[in-house]
């Protein structure tokens, strides 16, 4: 078989990326920027945030923070299963996961992937992991499970069919994980179910927000779940674009106009943004501090 020869510019790019991954300054700089950026967004939106009716929004805000942490914790578990297929290196995987959560907020989702690769290369050079492949698998399964959730709201039959299709795809993607202690099929079913729970959590948060601004029979959990799954899956699909973060906002706005008054759509989008930014900042910081304490206690 004839080998495909890559162009010189692509070889140079790959070489520079590898050098970048191994540079501790790059991962540190990216971590700092990932914290500054969401804080800046919150600061720029401070006038709108202060105008929120916190007397009624506070309860939903606090409940959403708790639900969000459950979802974040489950996604952290799934990440460890995807990259290792087991929990023997769960703490180191968790450290990388929470350290790079905020990088998803940076324009162009590729920074999240680059940050992960760089941290694994710098902090855990002796632990062999297929980070790039795992990033892709995580991204693809998240989109597929989001579509599974959406199809369930249209028809249970479509939901079941798409569920087994997603399990089959996930099993195929994980089949070469020779170090896995769990059979690929069992691992795939676990991952898909855990991600569906995460999608349900997002739908619940949106449902609380919608019922807070529009107490009508039109707003149901099923509708909220469908809107959340479809809008978020679309934004994940287009995450690589600089305006990827805004795609979910536009998708949410388009899908919510039939459920609530147009004047309240922007309010819900702002509330979603505030909850997610605050939750990412708070829970990632708290989790990293806990992991540091755990690491210190485990050190002889």
Predicted regions and their residues:
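Transmembrane helix boundary and interhelical loop/hinge segments in multi-pass membrane proteins
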Residues: 110-116, 245-252
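Hydrophobic alpha-helical segments and helix pairs
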Residues: 119-152, 159
């Amino acid at each position: 078989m004839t080998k495909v020869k890559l162009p010189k510019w692509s070889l140079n790019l790959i070489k520079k990326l590898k050098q970048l991954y191994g540079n501790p300054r790059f991962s540190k700089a990216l971590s700092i920027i990932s914290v500054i950026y969401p804080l800046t967004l919150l600061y720029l939106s401070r006038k709108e945030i202060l105008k929120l009716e916190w007397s009624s929004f506070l309860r939903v805000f606090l409940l959403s923070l708790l639900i969000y942490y459950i979802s974040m914790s489950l996604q952290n578990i799934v990440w460890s299963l995807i990259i290792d297929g087991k929990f023997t290196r769960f703490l180191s995987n968790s450290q990388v996961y929470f350290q790079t959560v905020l990088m998803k907020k940076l324009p162009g989702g590729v920074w999240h992937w680059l940050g992960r690769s760089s941290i694994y290369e710098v902090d855990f050079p002796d632990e062999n992991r297929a980070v790039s492949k795992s990033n892709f698998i995580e991204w693809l399964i998240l989109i597929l499970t989001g579509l599974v959730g959406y199809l369930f709201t249209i028809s249970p039959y479509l939901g079941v069919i798409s569920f087994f299709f997603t399990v089959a795809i996930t099993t195929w993607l994980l089949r070469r994980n020779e170090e896995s202690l769990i059979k690929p099929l069992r691992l795939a079913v676990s991952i898909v179910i855990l991600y569906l729970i995460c999608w349900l959590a997002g739908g619940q948060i949106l449902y609380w927000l919608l019922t807070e601004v529009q107490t009508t029979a039109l707003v149901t959990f099923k509708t909220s779940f469908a809107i959340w799954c479809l809008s978020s899956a679309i934004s994940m699909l287009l995450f690589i674009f600089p305006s990827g973060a805004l795609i979910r906002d536009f998708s949410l706005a388009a899908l919510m106009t039939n459920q609530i008054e147009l004047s309240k759509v922007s309010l819900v989008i702002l509330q979603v943004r505030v909850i997610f930014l605050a939750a990412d900042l708070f829970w990632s910081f708290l989790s990293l501090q806990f992991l540091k304490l755990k690491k210190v206690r485990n050190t002889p």
